[in-house]
């Protein structure tokens, strides 16, 4: 069961029979099966402890065997995990930092035997309750910051009428719109209220910003209007619009407003600090690094494009770090470069390379779409494929409404987008590609995945999502937090 990001929780493990040498349990970064190369903090049946997670063990670890009850008490706010044997405190592991989504697991110590365990997460009274700790169930999860994901990110579907129409029913007035035709080959059009909704950039192209008054013509309190352009409103054709809420008005931060080269260029932005999303326009990029993002936390995803000239889309992802980037408009693998400056983003600034020749800081103008993770609403991370139709499960803490995935190790694998509006049940099979103008496809079972109440599950073996041993980055947004979600 995944360790929560806040609160105090307990659960009990009753030790069963085994044929392997040792029982083993503990914390692990892998959402799938534990292996010796994973980052972990484990407690073994002979009393041995080990760790490759940042932190340390304290206390005296007892041995345990069949019939013993191990109580696990996890304090997310204090970043420690206590282990009790039959009600007596044993070892405690204290984390100095949390490098990813923690999981708790139980294992056998080899592939040549088995170890059995019985979990009590609160479905019956605990044998040894720990004062101040709650059972690990959805009722005891903390209240979410965003109780309904559709109030911050929403998906609209419509059928074209060939003239003009207004799309309604969103939970907000959208500030960032990503529109794609489903039933014919049309480009991915990205527009925003910071630049003005008649301006657009196309995610599968390197072309400069365009302007057209018959694509998106207006935004409303709960939607937007489209004109007669065939990429938005051809008669009887199907379309999807993915939308995000930023803010009601632009904020301008002058160059050097916060000190020398902070920021290094004037930044105009709209930011939704609650939902962790902002749109930043830099009309006159400078030969320095710092830019303001308007959010309260370090960004996890930055997608950017030169607006004045032809150039690729450069993407920062926190799982890759600032020394690497990947192009949204191509099937290429991640590349090492200084496109995102000489340091990681902070809670105030993001960084770009210090010259304006190309990429994430090209002269003439830049647009940046920026997100950070919000507990129970958005998640950004990575996973490693296993090449099996029983692929990795990735915990997000919410019912997934929208999912973006990309292989970062191998060239030739496409970006993919799935959402729960186009696929109301599992498996999710209707995919669209940010790096292609192709129409919606269902593909084969090798591309299937499940969008679940607490994450997503890879169901296919395609290289675009599950090559054995290769790394994939993802971005996911919530329909509802896990506390309020129901299975699809």
Regions found by a protein language model. Give the residues of each.
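Conserved "boundary/linchpin" sites in short secondary-structure elements
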Residues: 21-22
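A sequence-level detector for low-complexity, Ser/Thr- and acidic-rich stretches
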Residues: 25-26
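Catalytic cores of Mg2+-dependent Asp-rich isoprenoid enzymes
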Residues: 11
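Surface-exposed molecular-recognition determinants
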Residues: 1-8, 16-18, 30-488
């Amino acid at each position: 069961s995944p360790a929560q990001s806040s609160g105090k929780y307990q659960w009990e493990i009753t030790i069963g029979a085994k044929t392997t040498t040792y029982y083993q349990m503990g914390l692990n970064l892998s959402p799938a099966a534990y292996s010796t190369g994973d980052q972990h903090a484990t407690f073994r049946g002979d009393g041995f402890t080990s760790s490759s997670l940042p932190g340390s063990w304290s206390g005296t670890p007892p041995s345990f065997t069949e019939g013993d009850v191990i109580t696990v008490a996890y304090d997310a706010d204090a970043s420690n995990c206590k282990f009790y044997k039959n009600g007596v405190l044993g070892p405690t592991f204290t984390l100095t930092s949390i490098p990813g989504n923690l999981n708790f697991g139980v294992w056998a110590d080899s592939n040549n035997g088995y170890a059995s365990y019985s979990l009590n997460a609160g479905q019956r009274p605990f044998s040894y309750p720990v004062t101040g700790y709650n059972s690990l169930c959805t009722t005891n999860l903390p209240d979410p910051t965003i109780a309904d994901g559709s109030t911050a990110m929403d998906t609209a579907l419509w059928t074209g009428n060939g003239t003009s129409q207004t799309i309604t029913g969103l939970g907000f007035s959208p500030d960032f719109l990503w529109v794609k035709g489903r039933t014919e080959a049309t480009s991915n059009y990205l527009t925003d209220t910071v630049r003005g909704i008649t301006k657009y950039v196309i995610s599968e192209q390197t072309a400069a910003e365009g302007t057209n008054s018959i694509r998106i013509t207006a935004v409303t309190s709960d939607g937007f209007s489209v004109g007669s352009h065939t990429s938005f409103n051809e008669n009887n054709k199907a379309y999807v619009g993915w939308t995000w809420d930023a803010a009601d008005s632009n904020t301008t931060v002058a160059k050097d407003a916060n000190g020398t080269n902070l920021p290094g260029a004037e930044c105009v932005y709209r930011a939704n600090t609650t939902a962790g999303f902002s749109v930043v326009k830099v009309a006159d990029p400078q030969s320095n690094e710092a830019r303001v993002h308007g959010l309260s936390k370090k960004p996890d995803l930055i997608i950017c494009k030169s607006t004045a000239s032809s150039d690729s889309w450069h993407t920062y992802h926190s799982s890759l770090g600032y020394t690497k980037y990947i192009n949204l408009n191509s099937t290429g693998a991640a590349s090492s470069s200084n496109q995102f400056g000489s340091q990681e983003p902070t809670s105030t600034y993001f960084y770009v390379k210090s010259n304006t020749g190309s990429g994430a800081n090209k002269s003439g103008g830049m647009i940046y779409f920026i997100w950070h993770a919000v507990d129970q609403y958005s998640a950004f991370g990575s996973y490693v494929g296993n090449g099996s139709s029983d692929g990795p499960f990735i915990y997000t803490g919410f019912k997934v409404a929208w999912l973006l995935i990309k292989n970062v190790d191998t060239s030739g694998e496409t970006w993919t987008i799935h959402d729960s509006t186009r696929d109301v049940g599992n498996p999710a099979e209707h995919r669209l590609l940010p790096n292609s103008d192709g129409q919606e496809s269902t593909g084969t079972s090798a591309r299937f995945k499940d969008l679940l109440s607490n994450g997503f599950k890879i169901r296919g073996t395609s290289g675009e999502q599950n090559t054995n041993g290769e790394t994939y980055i993802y971005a996911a947004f919530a329909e509802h937090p896990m506390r309020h979600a129901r299975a699809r």
